[in-house]
Curated annotation (Swiss-Prot):
It comes from Pseudomonas aeruginosa. The lineage of its organism: Bacteria, Pseudomonadati, Pseudomonadota, Gammaproteobacteria, Pseudomonadales. The gene is bla. Hydrolyzes oxacillin, first-generation cephalosporins and ceftazidime. Does not hydrolyze cefotaxime or carbapenems. Substrate binds at K210, T211, G212. This is Beta-lactamase OXA-15. Belongs to the class-D beta-lactamase family. InterPro entries: Beta-lactam/transpept-like, Beta-lactam_class-D_AS, PCN-bd_Tpept. It catalyses: a beta-lactam + H2O = a substituted beta-amino acid.
Length: 275
């Protein structure tokens, strides 16, 4: 509870301070070393708002503009859709597990919004998708200008196996709107989603993030809030070794953020690892 109150006050201060700063773009080819260390191919976009002269830092600018399936990073906007459409009332509503073994212990249990976000519980979001419907989902996607705004699929979930796609650059643009409560949803819903995204927090910083994995590639997107401003990030990498490559997402991002002092080297005060 203390972390949630601190997070709200922290966000209000940061929003007021950095609403109208200027920004330049800088290619960080030197960040190749972080990808090479983990034998990974991918891109990262980092938007650093801690200074008056804000910076957009990019490794592999070409790939940063290429669209990929959002996979479970889509749970961020999908939760907003579900709240707005009434598919879920609040963070306390319980969704009963149907008893089907889905191969992951975190999925084989009753869920609420917090556990569904933390565990990337697909079956909960499949319930939301069915309740919302494709037509309304398409309207929501266009309304928030999310990637190609295409919720079509011939098989499976449209945010994993379907046509929906988004680039790392577009992920950053979306996250910034959410951070500032500028999306076309109730402010209390945007604040709730941001609360659900908290992964770690220290005395004067908060890390909010979400993983995603489509099978062939994986994401880690989010931001770190500091008193001087926030640092947004969106990474995607190829995952030819599938689950064996998943740890690389967070490892690369954390190494890069620490290299620009956007994450502290010390252990976090509170941690809630997301799959």
């Amino acid at each position: 509870m203390a972390i949630r109150i601190f997070a709200i006050l922290f966000s209000i201060f940061s929003l007021a301070t950095f609403a109208h700063a200027q920004e330049g773009t800088l290619e960080r080819s030197d960040w190749r070393k972080f990808f090479s260390e983990f034998q990974a191919k991918g891109t990262i976009v980092v938007a650093d708002e801690r200074q008056a002269d804000r910076a957009m830092l990019v490794f592999d600018p070409v790939r940063s503009k290429k669209r990929y399936s959002p996979a479970s990073t889509f749970k961020i906007p999908h939760t907003l859709f579900a709240l707005d459409a009434g598919a879920v009332r609040d963070e306390f509503q319980i969704f009963r597990w149907d008893g089907v073994n889905r191969g992951f212990a975190g999925h084989n249990q009753d869920q609420d919004l917090r556990s569904a976000m933390r565990n990337s519980t697909v079956w909960v979001y499949e319930l939301f998708a069915k309740e919302i419907g494709d037509d309304k989902a398409r309207r929501y996607l266009k309304k928030i200008d999310y990637g190609n705004a295409g919720p079509s699929t011939s098989n499976g979930d449209y945010w994993i196996e379907g046509s929906l796609a988004i680039s790392a650059q577009e992920q950053i643009a979306f996250l910034r709107k959410l951070y500032r409560n500028e999306l076309p949803f109730r402010v209390e819903h945007q604040r709730l989603v941001k609360d659900l995204m908290i992964v770690e927090a220290g005395r004067n910083w908060i890390l909010r993030a979400k993983t995603g994995w489509e099978g062939r590639m994986g994401w880690w997107v989010g931001w770190v809030e500091w008193p001087t401003g926030s640092v947004f990030f969106a990474l995607n990498i190829d995952t030819p070794n599938r689950m064996d490559d998943l740890f690389k997402r967070e490892a690369i991002v954390r190494a890069i953020l620490r290299s620009i002092e956007a994450l502290p080297p010390n252990p976090a005060v509170n941690s809630d690892a997301a799959r």
